[in-house]
Design a protein with these regions (language model features):
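Tandem repeat scaffolds
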Residues: 1-113
């Protein structure tokens, strides 16, 4: 599924398990009961999502973009998020590990010394 365009799609009750989702585009999608489990979403784009019940487990979100897409209550702590691109609105309420929080601090303009 590399580079698949899901633009303007509505996805309901879908689990992407061990899926190769690199470079996929989920712009303007509606997500309801969606799970990414051990999915490789390197450089995927999630822009302007309408999210109801999203879970992400043990997935690669490296260099992925989450813009105007709520990650509230989404646990990212066991996923790789190196180089993630996001905005404060999307990030608010996301659950991350201590190490992830340190790297995400740059988005907030915080320098850790």
């Amino acid at each position: 599924m590399i580079g698949t365009s899901f633009i303007d799609s509505t996805l309901v009750d879908v689990t992407f398990h061990s899926s190769l989702m690199r470079y996929s585009n989920f712009a303007n999608c509606k997500f309801q009961h969606i799970s990414f489990v051990k999915a490789d979403c390197l450089q995927a784009s999630f822009h302007y999502l309408d999210v109801k019940d999203l879970s992400i487990l043990e997935s690669c979100l490296d260099e992925t973009e989450f813009l105007e897409s709520s990650l509230n209550q989404v646990d990212l702590s066991d996923s790789s998020i190196s180089g993630i691109v996001t905005d404060l609105k999307s990030l608010k309420g996301a659950k991350v590990s201590f190490e992830q929080a340190a790297s995400l601090a740059q988005i907030l303009g915080v320098t850790i010394v």
